[in-house]
Amino acid sequence: MAVPQRRTSKTRKRMRRTHFKLEIPGMIKCDNCSEYKLAHRVCPSCGHYKGVKVAK
């Protein structure tokens, strides 16, 4: 059975885990109502996308 030859150091373990982080979604202000929304999506509060009303 495969067994590690040496114990993994704190530094190596932490360097490996640097990529396991959460990312904050790209929030922007809506041009119409100035509420925060996700980029490239319809505004949930007013229903505008690129200056055009697309949702009720």
Swiss-Prot record:
Name the UniProt key words of this record, in alphabetical order.
Answer: Ribonucleoprotein, Ribosomal protein
Q: Which InterPro entries match?
A: Ribosomal_bL32, Ribosomal_bL32_bact, Ribosomal_zn-bd
TM helices/strands, residue ranges? none
User: Its GO CC terms?
Assistant: large ribosomal subunit
- Give the highest taxon in the source lineage: Bacteria
Q: Which SUPFAM superfamilies match?
A: Zn-binding ribosomal proteins
Q: Which family does it belong to?
A: Belongs to the bacterial ribosomal protein bL32 family.
Protein name listed in UniProt: Large ribosomal subunit protein bL32
Q: Give the source species.
A: Brevibacillus brevis (strain 47 / JCM 6285 / NBRC 100599)
